């Protein structure tokens, strides 16, 4: 049954206007980053992959850190893996610029966190508390150089990720465009992160 005074063409017009209004209103409240489509990159370089618990992902990561010449940038949700922490500390001691952005809540609530130990050994540590979880697991080694390396995957830098969980880690070399995208994201988080203690 039609409402009095509204013809079908008026109803269609009003429905169309409402649809346009709702669509443009939603776009107005959408963060600008959502409007930018994710980039598509050409595959290049090499990729090493490790799966846990069957493979030594911690060694793969530590070996990559051992090869760092100038810089290691890290984003970590949780950090309890001693071998990886030791590799970062050793890199710092040999003059490599090492910066870690960690999730504040995880750092404060996990008694076995190695963040304080790394900070006490000269690693520059920053806390990211701008998100429900700072859940990135990323390392950028020598970004901007020919040997730039990106490490990422589900693998938290933890003992549990190595010995208890089913995880994966990718070590990618020779894809500067991909490293640059991750570096841009790392810098976005670094801008709002706060120094540890």
Regions found by a protein language model. Give the residues of each.
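Structural recognition of the beta-strand scaffold that forms the well-ordered cores
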Residues: 48-50, 73-76, 99-103, 126-127, ...
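DNA replication sliding-clamp ring fold and its partner-interaction surfaces
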Residues: 57-60, 64-71, 178-182
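Bacterial N-terminal signal peptides that target proteins for export
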Residues: 2-17
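Signature of lipid phosphatidyltransferase scaffolds
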Residues: 29-38, 142, 146-197
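N-terminal signal peptide c-region/cleavage motif recognized by signal peptidases
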Residues: 23-25
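N-terminal low-complexity, Pro/Thr/Ser-rich intrinsically disordered segments
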Residues: 29-54
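Primarily the HKD phosphodiesterase
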Residues: 63, 67-124
């Amino acid at each position: 049954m039609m409402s009095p005074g509204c013809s079908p063409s008026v109803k269609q017009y009003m429905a169309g206007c409402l649809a346009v209004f709702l669509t443009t209103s939603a776009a107005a409240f959408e963060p600008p980053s959502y409007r930018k489509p994710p980039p598509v990159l050409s595959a290049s370089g090499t990729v090493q992959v490790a799966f846990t618990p069957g493979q030594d992902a911690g060694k793969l990561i530590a070996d990559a850190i051992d090869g760092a010449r100038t810089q290691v940038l890290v984003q970590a949700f949780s950090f309890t893996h001693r071998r990886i922490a030791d590799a970062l500390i050793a890199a710092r001691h040999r003059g490599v610029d090492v910066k870690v952005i960690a999730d504040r809540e995880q750092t404060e609530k996990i008694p076995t966190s190695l963040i304080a130990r790394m900070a006490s050994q000269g690693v520059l540590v920053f806390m990211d508390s701008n998100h429900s979880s700072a859940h990135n697991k990323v390392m950028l080694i020598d970004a901007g150089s020919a040997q730039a390396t990106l490490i990422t995957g589900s693998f938290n830098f933890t003992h549990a990720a190595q010995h208890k969980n089913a995880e994966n880690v990718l070590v990618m070399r020779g894809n500067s465009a991909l490293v640059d995208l991750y570096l841009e994201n790392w810098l976005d988080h670094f801008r709002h992160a706060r120094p540890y203690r």
